[in-house]
Amino acid sequence: MKKNAPKSFEEALSRLESLTQAMQGEMPLEDALAAYQEGNELVIYCQTKLAQVEQKLQVLDADGLKELNLESDE
């Protein structure tokens, strides 16, 4: 992330939601491309943070080392 790197996962997610809403409206092509690029960087940031948290959870559960299932059965 180059400029304005998010300080947290929640901040990145909030920015992604804002970009998504903006792109659903009327937006000049150049702005849409910039928003898409920023969104892609934010997705990578969020995926990295989630992978780090998953890894930490596995370490914390070292006694039984169960696989983490983040999907609900609902």
Swiss-Prot record:
GO molecular function: exodeoxyribonuclease VII activity
Function: Bidirectionally degrades single-stranded DNA into large acid-insoluble oligonucleotides, which are then degraded further into small acid-soluble oligonucleotides.
Gene3D superfamilies in UniProt: Exonuclease VII, small subunit
GO biological process: DNA catabolic process
Major site of localization recorded for this protein: cytoplasm
Keyword match Transport: no
Keyword Nucleotide-binding carried by entry: no
Catalytic reactions on record: Exonucleolytic cleavage in either 5'- to 3'- or 3'- to 5'-direction to yield nucleoside 5'-phosphates
Location(s), subcellular: Cytoplasm
Annotated EC: 3.1.11.6
InterPro entries in UniProt: Exonuc_VII_S, Exonuc_VII_ssu_sf
Oligomer and partners: Heterooligomer composed of large and small subunits.
Similarity section: Belongs to the XseB family.
UniProt keyword annotations, A-Z: Cytoplasm, Exonuclease, Hydrolase, Nuclease
HAMAP family, per the entry: Exonuc_7_S
Protein name: Exodeoxyribonuclease 7 small subunit
This protein's GO CC annotations: cytosol; exodeoxyribonuclease VII complex
